Amino acid sequence: MSNRLFFIKKCYNLAQLMRINQPIGFFLLLWPTLWGLWLSHKGIPDKVVLIVFVAGALCMRSAGCIINDYVDYDIDGHVQRTKTRPLPSGMIRKKEALVALSILLFIAFILVLSLNFITIFLSVVALILSWIYPYLKRYIYFPQVMLGLLFSWPILMAFTAINNPINSTAWLLFLMNTVWTIVYDTQYAMIDREDDIYVGIKSSAVLFGDMDKFLIGILQLCIVFILGIIGWKERFTVVFYFFSLFGVIILFMWQQILINKRKRIRYFQAFLSNNYVGMLVFIGIASSFH
């Protein structure tokens, strides 16, 4: 193989390692980031802050994927869906993964340096949590809670970035997004449930068992309730209630239909549809400040 082809192949494998070919994870991190930015600014955020947060979300999502695969190196090879990933398949060496991770973290660090001290501190806490998360599924049945905290962290940072106090609305949004993350990551974990049981990995999907559909429904009702409280508290416009609240209810009903079919492809479709949940909430929030 020529050096040029080798380089192209290596870049392609690194892109797969960072899930560039699967942007759903980036969007699921981006939407709550945008919710927090628009709510903290009461409208369109400062351009520099917006760029820092969007670029930071992209870097940290990719870094999180590398951390997860690095920690799960000895497990992914035994799971049908993950055994072809770059690290367990040998297409990327562990040292190469660490180099890529270091570059991403350096870029994220440079970005966050443009923000204030408390926001920098919160970003360091987020990095620590990112390393803890992959280990939790070996010991507890709710690693999804930690993932929820991680994916909700930018909401707090969005408020501190402009020296705003983390008010009750921010905490409600934080709570809602944490519950939402538990919902969609449980849907995702349902895909690998049989494999996870075989290799001894714990997840909410394994814990819920046959009660998964019902318990996900309870969590979805909690999300709708919290979203309604936020809309009422912030006196959002009718667009919020029509697009966000009503739209989210319809999407959650659709997800219930999908997961009821008890097929892996349907679980994955339900998971993917959460991108539209995040988008609809953002449309409702953004439209309420114009």
UniProtKB/Swiss-Prot annotation:
PROSITE patterns, alphabetized: UBIA
Cellular component, GO, one term: plasma membrane
InterPro entries, alphabetized: HB_polyprenyltransferase-like, Prenyltransferase, UbiA_prenyltransferase, UbiA_prenylTrfase_CS, UbiA_sf
Top-level taxon of the source organism: Bacteria
Reactions catalysed, as given in the entry: all-trans-octaprenyl diphosphate + 4-hydroxybenzoate = 4-hydroxy-3-(all-trans-octaprenyl)benzoate + diphosphate
EC number(s) per entry: 2.5.1.39
Cofactor: Mg(2+)
Pathway assignment: Cofactor biosynthesis; ubiquinone biosynthesis
Keyword terms, alphabetized: Cell inner membrane, Cell membrane, Magnesium, Membrane, Transferase, Transmembrane, Transmembrane helix, Ubiquinone biosynthesis
Record GO biological process: ubiquinone biosynthetic process
Ranges annotated as spanning the membrane: 24-44, 48-68, 98-118, 142-162, 171-191, 214-234, 239-259, 270-290
Record Pfam families: UbiA
Record's subcellular location: Cell inner membrane
Membrane-related topology note: Multi-pass membrane protein
Chief location category: membrane
GO molecular function: 4-hydroxybenzoate polyprenyltransferase activity
Family stated for the protein in its record: Belongs to the UbiA prenyltransferase family.
NCBIfam families: ubiA_proteo (TIGR01474)
Function recorded in the entry: Catalyzes the prenylation of para-hydroxybenzoate (PHB) with an all-trans polyprenyl group. Mediates the second step in the final reaction sequence of ubiquinone-8 (UQ-8) biosynthesis, which is the condensation of the polyisoprenoid side chain with PHB, generating the first membrane-bound Q intermediate 3-octaprenyl-4-hydroxybenzoate.
Protein name: 4-hydroxybenzoate octaprenyltransferase
